[in-house]
Amino acid sequence: MRVSRRSTSIAAAALVVVLLGALAALVGSSSSQASPKASNATFLAALVSDIGKFNDRSFNQSQLEGLKRAQRLLHVKIKPLQSNTTSDYIPNFSTAIRAKSNITIAAGFLLADTLETVADKFPKSKFAITDYCAKGATKCITGSVLKKNHKNVMGIDYAANQSGCLVGYLAAEMAKKQGGKQVIGAVGGLHIPPVDIWIAGYQFCAKLYNKNITVLIGYSGDFVAADKCKTVAENQLAQGAQVLFQVAGGCGLGTLTAAAQAGKWGIGVDKDQYKDAKRVLSLIHI
């Protein structure tokens, strides 16, 4: 039984909106503007993944699906560039620039330093980065701000604390239904702002539902290796966790596996991860 299941189209649709916003803000500022219909056929949008790769069934994959949806709906050209290691970051950005991409999107926090270097070197190229804010932004939810004020870079920030809040409230309710001591857990990847804000919202609203609930929080230090998240999750299960929430990309699939093997509920992130564990309680990505 699942309480709710959101399809992957939610994440994809969100990325389409992000892409549209990026196009309007970055490309629309160009002095020579063609009509949308005339320009779409030649418009090239590139996406550089982090080391989680496009098959992480989470963060990177959801962005790729959003890009592909933009291709279908907006009829733009796309260029996904997968990073297998951090040494691929610079070459992938270079490939996008050589291909004359109209906008190159960096998939998240781990690419920030590289993006800043590239943006400085290629001031005429347009970039965007998810889970980050441009320097001088009037509002930045995650608190992750680029070091320099790049006129050619757009930051894309999410209210992940609100999504985390909904998940925390739901987890607390499910724990209550199971009876006994109320314990839930959260397994993060790296201890970075985009992850911390998810977990902060999760903990806050779990406590809002039940002030006496115990919320266990752990980090794997990784976004890729599922066994590392599985180890953290198993430790939380041993402490009585009744529901586990993962915020760790592909690594977090290990959290869902551990929960399923223990007969407990797991909560996925970024994409519908029900098929990966069969005990996923809900997916919420807003």
Where are these regions (language model features)?
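An alpha-beta-alpha
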Residues: 67, 164-213, 217
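Short beta-strand elements in bilobed, periplasmic/extracellular small-molecule ligand-binding domains
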Residues: 74-83, 210-223
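Periplasmic-binding protein-like
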Residues: 101-109, 126-130, 240-249, 267-269
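Flexible loop/hinge segments that line or gate small-molecule binding clefts
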Residues: 123-157, 270-278
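C-terminal region of N-terminal signal peptides and the immediate post-cleavage residues
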Residues: 22-41
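Conserved small/polar residues in nucleotide/adenosyl-binding loops
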Residues: 284-286
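Short, well-structured alpha-helical segments in soluble
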Residues: 86-100, 226-240
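Extracytoplasmic "Venus flytrap"
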Residues: 40, 45-70, 79-89, 109-111, ...
